[in-house]
C-alpha cells in the first residue's frame, strides 16, 4: 500500500506542473464572465471529465501509437523533453497570457455570439490542462514504468487511473473555487507560481533529454 501512495505522489509531482490548474483558473475566469453559477459549475465538471479521458487515452493508447509509427523510447524521451522544456520556457518567460492564446480568442468570439458555448474541451481541457506536454509526459512515463521493476505490477495497474482522477479532481476543485483562488492569490501570485512551475518543467525536460541520449549511447556503445 505504501508503494501505491509513493507512485501516486510521484505521478502528481510530475503531472501537476504540466497541468498547472492555476493557469486554467485564470483562463476560465476570463472566458466565463457572462456565465451564471450553474453553467460555470457544469463547465468545470465537464473540463475535469475531459482531462481525465484525455490522460487515460494517452496512457493506454500511447504504446500502440509508438509501435505503429516505430517510435523508440529514447526518441520519445528526447521529443517529450524538448516539448516539456519549451513549455517550461514559455511559462518562465511568458510572451502572452493564457487568455490571449488563439484557442481562447476563438472561444471568446464564440461566446460573444452564444454565451452558453462549450469551453470545457477547448481551451480548458486541451491545450490548457492536458496539452501536448502533458500527453508526451504521460506516454513517455507509461513506457518507462512498464519496463521498470520499482513498483509491483498491481501498483502499475491501479496508480495511473488514480493519478489522473486526482488531477481531474484538483482541476474541478480549482475551477469551482476560481473566484476565491483569484482573490486569495491574485494575478501576481498565479504568475509567480506559474514561473516556478515553468522552471521545474525546464529541469524535467532537460533531464528527459539527457536520459534519452544516455539510452542511445548505451544501445550503440
From Swiss-Prot:
It is a multi-pass membrane protein. It comes from the Bacteria. InterPro entries: Multi_antbiot-R_MarC (IPR002771). Keywords: Cell inner membrane, Cell membrane, Membrane, Transmembrane, Transmembrane helix. It is found in: Cell inner membrane. Signal peptide: none annotated. The chain crosses the membrane at residues 8-28, 45-65, 69-89, 119-139, 155-175, 197-217. Pfam families: MarC (PF01914). Its main location: membrane. Coiled coil: none annotated. One of its GO terms (cellular component) is plasma membrane. Residues 1-7, 66-68, 140-154, 218-221 are periplasmic. This is UPF0056 inner membrane protein MarC. It comes from Escherichia coli (strain SMS-3-5 / SECEC). The lineage of its organism: Bacteria, Pseudomonadati, Pseudomonadota, Gammaproteobacteria, Enterobacterales. The gene is marC.
Amino acid at each position: 500500500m505504501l508503494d501505491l501512495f509513493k507512485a501516486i505522489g510521484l505521478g502528481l509531482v510530475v503531472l501537476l506542473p504540466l497541468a498547472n490548474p492555476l493557469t486554467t483558473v485564470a483562463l476560465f475566469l476570463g472566458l466565463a464572465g457572462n456565465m451564471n453559477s450553474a453553467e460555470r459549475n457544469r463547465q468545470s465538471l465537464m473540463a475535469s471529465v475531459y482531462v481525465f479521458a484525455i490522460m487515460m487515452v494517452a496512457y493506454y493508447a500511447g504504446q500502440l501509437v509508438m509501435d505503429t509509427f516505430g517510435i523508440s523510447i529514447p526518441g520519445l524521451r528526447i521529443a517529450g523533453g524538448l516539448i516539456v522544456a519549451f513549455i517550461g520556457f514559455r511559462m518562465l518567460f511568458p510572451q502572452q497570457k493564457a487568455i490571449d492564446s488563439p484557442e481562447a480568442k476563438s472561444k471568446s468570439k464564440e461566446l460573444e455570439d452564444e454565451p452558453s458555448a462549450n469551453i470545457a474541451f477547448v481551451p480548458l481541457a486541451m491545450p490548457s490542462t492536458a496539452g501536448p506536454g502533458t500527453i508526451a509526459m504521460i506516454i513517455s512515463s507509461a513506457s518507462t514504468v512498464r519496463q521498470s521493476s520499482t513498483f509491483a505490477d498491481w501498483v502499475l495497474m491501479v496508480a495511473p487511473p488514480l493519478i489522473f482522477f486526482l488531477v481531474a479532481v484538483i482541476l474541478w476543485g480549482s475551477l469551482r473555487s476560481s473566484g476565491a483562488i483569484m482573490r486569495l492569490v491574485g494575478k501576481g501570485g498565479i504568475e509567480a507560481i506559474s514561473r516556478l512551475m515553468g522552471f521545474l518543467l525546464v529541469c524535467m525536460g532537460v533531464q528527459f533529454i539527457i536520459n534519452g541520449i544516455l539510452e542511445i549511447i548505451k544501445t550503440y556503445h
